[in-house]
């Protein structure tokens, strides 16, 4: 049974969010990166996940809730914090970047 996981790029002016499919601990990209606040990453991610009808509603809701939490954290001062703190706050999300 496939599992899905968020990944994020923690950038100076943007937060980029994408979804990977996880099979046997191996990650494969499932979506492109969606950027916040440059674009409405949450709405774009929602539309992309809804277009993949084989992803369960429960998985879509879980991923969107995680994306909401991550966006809120980034917006509310998290972008000023080290990536290591964001990774500790969100251990289920793979976070990288240059900020």
From Swiss-Prot:
The keyword NAD does not apply. Keywords: Ribonucleoprotein, Ribosomal protein. Pfam families: PSRP-3_Ycf65. It comes from the Bacteria. InterPro entries: PSRP-3/Ycf65_sf (IPR038447), Ribosomal_PSRP3/Ycf65 (IPR006924). One of its GO terms (cellular component) is ribosome. The keyword Ribosomal protein applies. One of its GO terms (molecular function) is structural constituent of ribosome. One of its GO terms (biological process) is translation. Part of the 30S ribosomal subunit. Probably a ribosomal protein or a ribosome-associated protein. Belongs to the chloroplast-specific ribosomal protein cS23 family. NCBIfam families: PRK02724.1. This is Probable small ribosomal subunit protein cS23. It comes from Synechococcus sp. (strain JA-3-3Ab) (Cyanobacteria bacterium Yellowstone A-Prime).
């Amino acid at each position: 049974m496939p599992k899905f996981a968020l990944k994020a790029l923690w950038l100076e002016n943007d937060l980029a969010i994408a979804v990977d499919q996880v099979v046997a601990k191996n990650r494969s990209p499932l979506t492109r990166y969606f950027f916040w606040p440059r674009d409405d990453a949450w709405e774009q991610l929602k539309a992309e996940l809804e277009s993949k009808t084989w992803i369960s509603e429960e998985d879509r809701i879980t991923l969107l809730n995680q994306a909401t939490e991550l966006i809120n954290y980034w917006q509310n001062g998290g972008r000023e914090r080290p990536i290591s703190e964001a990774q500790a706050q969100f251990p289920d999300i793979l976070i990288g970047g240059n900020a």
